[in-house]
Amino acid sequence: MGGKSRAESFFTAEEREAVTAAVQTAESETSGEIVAFVAPASHDHPQAAMVGGFLLALPLALLAMPWLGGFFWLGRENVWIFLICLTLFYLPLRLLVAKTPTLKRLFLFTEQVQEEVGEAALAAFYGHKLDATRERNGVLLFISVFERRVFILADKGVNDKVDAACWRGMVDSLTTAIRHGDRGPAVCRTIADIGTVLRQHFPPRPDDRNELDDLIVAS
């Protein structure tokens, strides 16, 4: 059996229970629907491995070129020796970066990561039917573990009444907390904040029912 994914190990068992309870508590005071979604990663980021492999291989090839060129009597600045060294170093280093999350993260492009996580959040939003609630008042709290990014996406009924700026402070606070190791409690606080916003615009209904999953942890 394989080990747990980044998403599956993001919360402890107790934190999972607390997050689920936080969603249920928030939803008990509003007709709005909240889904907390934890993804291990939003993209494979192959360009990070390519860029990282090249940038790590380049100085090694430059260091090896004069030594090997001299050893084979081909000159200390032989371009063919350099290209061979670059290729030989690049291939294993590219694989190393691809397989090492800490290294891989160093070579991510911020704007591209933001776009890719946003696309993954949107796919999760529609894939898990947050656009299909009775009052169009579903809110997705999307956490992408590898990229260390958070998105909050709301359906049309919420967006018609709540300014997008309302979510930015929550996203920034949760992102900072997660990066400092505060996961479960910070997510619970954010869910409570989302519930407070929904309660102001979508009071509970007598016939209200839970339309969506409370917590989804992707493998």
Regions found by a protein language model. Name each.
Residues 3, 8, 12, 43-49, ...:
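Alpha-helical transmembrane cores and adjacent cytosolic helix/loop segments
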Residues 3-6, 146-182:
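Flexible, solvent-exposed short loops/turns enriched in glycine
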Residues 10-34:
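Short, charged cytosolic
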Residues 33-38, 138-144, 151-153:
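Soluble periplasmic/extracytoplasmic beta-strand elements of cell-envelope proteins
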Residues 46-58:
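Select subsegments of transmembrane alpha-helices in polytopic membrane proteins
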Residues 65-106:
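Transmembrane alpha-helices and immediately adjacent membrane-cytoplasm interface residues
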Residues 107-127:
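Membrane-cytosol interface motif
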Residues 169-219:
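Cytosol-/stroma-facing membrane-proximal "stalk/adaptor" domains immediately downstream
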